[in-house]
């Protein structure tokens, strides 16, 4: 049976809860709201939780942000600070001090707009490792050494991303790795409006069926934090969501006592999803869909994520000071 594509832990848990009455066994969920941003923390506590939602044991924090194509500078700063606070909570578990090196990796293909989030973020980061090495007297002691790389993809370099990162890790020996990647979602509403942070590493391309070498503490020997935004949704998922909206609207317009209402209510969600996939697949294959404004959206999201990472990695500096280094 085809499984719905999603890289988001919060969606994986929702899918499990749709199939069972007890969705919390082995999984703890906390939700809070900061103004217009809803923050959901999913903790996969044990093997049971891992099996149920098919996500590795660890912490996954999801930020649902307002869906706007273009944010003004105040909006970007506000969202960046909230994101930085949540990222800092994950980073704190690695017990870093200001002298420890962080490697930031921008995964993805810069030639494909929805997959270019990682490389775009790298271009907006405050990188300091070279400054700490070559002009240490000109740099404040509280500034952490940060280095960054956008390794490209197998089709461009001929090398597995994991091989490239492993070689870099062996040479510069970072104390923490932060990976940024574009993800896939199972709901249209989460495309380009959700940021996920996790401390279990990442498998580049897994959301779209391109399984590459896992980047994690197990494979690299260094703690790996993954930051991602879903930028695409499967065409079958989009069709399924559209039909769900139609069904819900029809339910509201017919009497609950009618046979037609009973028929609508009896439609099995999983069977419907599978039917849509089987009908569409011969015609469109593995088609992925992204909004037409994706160029502007990627620019905005990369600013938000880069600013948030800069704030989280350089707690001794104000954002205005960070921007002097970046701009």
UniProtKB/Swiss-Prot annotation:
Q: What is its EC number?
A: 3.4.24.78
Show the propeptide residue ranges: 1-7
PTM comment text:
Autoproteolytically processed. The inactive tetrameric zymogen termed p46 autoprocesses to a smaller form termed p41, which is active only during spore germination.
The reaction(s) annotated as catalysed by this protein in its Swiss-Prot or TrEMBL entry are: Endopeptidase action with P4 Glu or Asp, P1 preferably Glu > Asp, P1' hydrophobic and P2' Ala
What is one GO biological process annotated to this record? spore germination
Record-annotated disulphide pairs: none
The highest taxon in the source lineage is Bacteria
For this UniProt entry, the molecular function terms from Gene Ontology, in alphabetical order, are: metalloendopeptidase activity
In the UniProt record, does the keyword Cell membrane occur? no
Alphabetized UniProt keyword annotations: Hydrolase, Protease, Zymogen
The cross-references to InterPro entries, in alphabetical order and at most eight, read: Pept_HybD-like_dom_sf, Peptidase_A25
- For whether the record's keyword set contains Signal, the answer is no
**Enzyme class, broadest EC rank:** hydrolase
- Quaternary structure and interacting proteins, as annotated: Homotetramer.
Task: Tell me the NCBIfam families matching this sequence.
Answer: GPR
Q: What does this protein do?
A: Initiates the rapid degradation of small, acid-soluble proteins during spore germination.
The family annotation for this protein states:
Belongs to the peptidase A25 family.
Can you say what this protein is called? Germination protease
């Amino acid at each position: 049976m085809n499984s719905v594509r999603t890289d988001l832990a919060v969606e994986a848990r929702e899918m499990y809860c749709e199939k069972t009455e007890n969705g919390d066994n082995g999984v703890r969920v906390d939700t809070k709201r900061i103004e217009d941003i809803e923050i959901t923390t999913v903790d996969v506590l044990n093997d049971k939780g891992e099996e149920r939602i098919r996500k590795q044991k660890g912490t996954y924090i999801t930020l649902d942000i307002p869906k706007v194509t273009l944010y003004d500078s105040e909006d970007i700063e506000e969202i960046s600070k909230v994101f930085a606070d949540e990222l800092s909570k994950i980073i704190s578990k690695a017990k870093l001090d200001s002298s420890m090196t962080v490697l930031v990796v921008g995964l993805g293909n810069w030639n494909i707009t929805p997959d270019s989030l990682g490389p775009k973020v790298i271009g907006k980061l405050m990188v300091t490792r070279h400054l700490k090495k070559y002009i240490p007297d000109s740099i404040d002691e509280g500034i952490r050494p940060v280095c960054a790389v956008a390794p490209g993809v197998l089709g461009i370099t001929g090398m597995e991303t994991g091989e490239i990162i492993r070689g870099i890790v062996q040479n510069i020996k970072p104390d923490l790795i932060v990976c940024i990647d574009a993800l896939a979602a199972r709901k249209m509403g989460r495309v380009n409006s959700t940021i996920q942070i996790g401390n279990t590493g990442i498998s580049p391309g897994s959301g779209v069926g391109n399984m590459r070498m896992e980047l994690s503490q197990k494979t690299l020997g260094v703690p790996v934090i993954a930051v991602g935004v879903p930028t695409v949704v499967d065409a079958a998922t989009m069709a399924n969501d559209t039909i769900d909206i139609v069904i819900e609207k029809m339910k509201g317009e017919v009497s609950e006592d009618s046979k037609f209402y009973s028929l609508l209510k009896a439609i099995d969600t999983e069977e419907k999803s599978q039917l849509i996939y089987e009908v569409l697949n011969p015609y469109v294959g593995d088609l992925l869909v992204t909004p037409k404004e994706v160029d502007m959206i990627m620019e905005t999201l990369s600013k938000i994520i880069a600013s948030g990472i800069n704030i989280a990695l350089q707690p001794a500096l104000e954002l205005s000071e960070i921007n002097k280094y970046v701009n």
